[in-house]
Amino acid sequence: MRRPHRLKASRRIPRILLPVVAAALLLLLLPLLPGTPSARGATAPDSPSDCALRGTTGWTDEGHNTDSSVFKRPSGNIKVAMIFVDFPDAVAGDESAADDAAQLTPGADWLWDASYGKAWLDITQHQRWVRMPHNSTDYGYERGMTHEQHEAYVKDAVTAADADVDFSQYDMVYVVPTKKASAISHTPTYVYQPGTEGVVADGSKVKWAVTFGQDMWHWGKKVVAHETGHTFGLPDLYAFDKGDDEHRFVGGWDVMGLIGGAGPQYFAWHSWKLGWTDDSQVVCRASAGSDTVDLTAVEYGSGTKMAVVPTGPTTAYVVESRRKVQGDDGVCSTGALVYKVDSSVKTGEGPIRVMDAKPNATPASNCRPLDDAPYWAGESFTDDAAGVRIEVLSADSDGETVRITKS
């Protein structure tokens, strides 16, 4: 049996110099110091629980509640078995499994940064090609493949690798195909449906799997963050009905939308849902009133991450700050990003929609519509019908100060 290659956690904060770490620690302590509240107003903010919308779709959605019996809790070490498959009609030959893995494994560091060090993908690579029992063209591997078809693919892959892998030791499975299997085109996520037979190996159910396709060579490490996000319960933010623009809902913001977008850091709403952002970092204005909030950019772990104004049982407006650092080092515009959340909307139908501060502007070169959506100091967003107003009062290198009002 060949020794597996394990991707080790560095247990560090990548690419941050010591002075910046010290500054981040100071930011973390600021809310605890007298006279430095993150939210100020005539009335105290409401409890964050008043802004925690409940999901109603029964699957991946924007509800704050996530069914841990269905979806993986994204904290600590997440043990992943990475296996490599070829097919009778697409033989890997001398293709290097290690080279294929190198296209994906940097996703562990990306997710570590995006989760503020709360979640680590502990990937063990079983670098041996195992043969699937059917041709690559026999799996119905196209958009719209059924859950049953996908489960059959996962089952065949797990069965083929079972002699070398003890699947009971892992939380989830990554299946990597030979690049010669062009029929394995895209990368879907498998989530076990409770009450069904599912896939069993070594006395354990395989509850979560990502079956990579040839699009991994286009998206690279961030496809890991997108698809693994589904195992955590996050929905797709791009439009299943492509229309004129399949990324019309959120543009390049959040990796659950456009994987290769300019600002792929998870929305603060997602970070809160996943447990990476604490209640203490959320300002909620559910009752009539106003709050002045000092937002720290979502790319940093400390400080207040978002202000939320609910407008109904399943809807809310959120404002967060974005900066051109870390996972968002390619953003086209920085500032206060405002978006509407609707936890009753299904995946792929626009459960989050970014509000565009500059709807008539022409995007800069290499940027897309909505990439310039953030609001700048002196600008404001208003929804008169919902009684919501969000004003950007000032900005600095760390974030924005905003005033949220609910009438």
Regions found by a protein language model. Give the residues of each.
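Non-catalytic C-terminal accessory/binding modules of secreted extracellular proteins
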Residues: 2-3, 34, 48, 53-55, ...
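Secretory targeting and sorting signals
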Residues: 4-39
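Zn2+-dependent metallopeptidase catalytic core
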Residues: 38-216, 225, 242, 379, ...
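Short, solvent-exposed loop/turn segments at the edges of secondary structure
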Residues: 77, 249-251, 333
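Non-catalytic surface loops within mature trypsin-like serine protease
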Residues: 86-89, 179, 260, 323, ...
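Short acidic, gly/pro-rich beta-turn/loop elements at beta-sheet edges
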Residues: 92-93, 185, 266, 329, ...
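Short, polar loop/linker segments at the starts of domains and inter-domain junctions
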Residues: 93-105, 266-270, 331-333, 351-356
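Extracellular hydrolytic enzyme modules, especially secreted metalloproteases
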Residues: 167, 172-174, 180-328
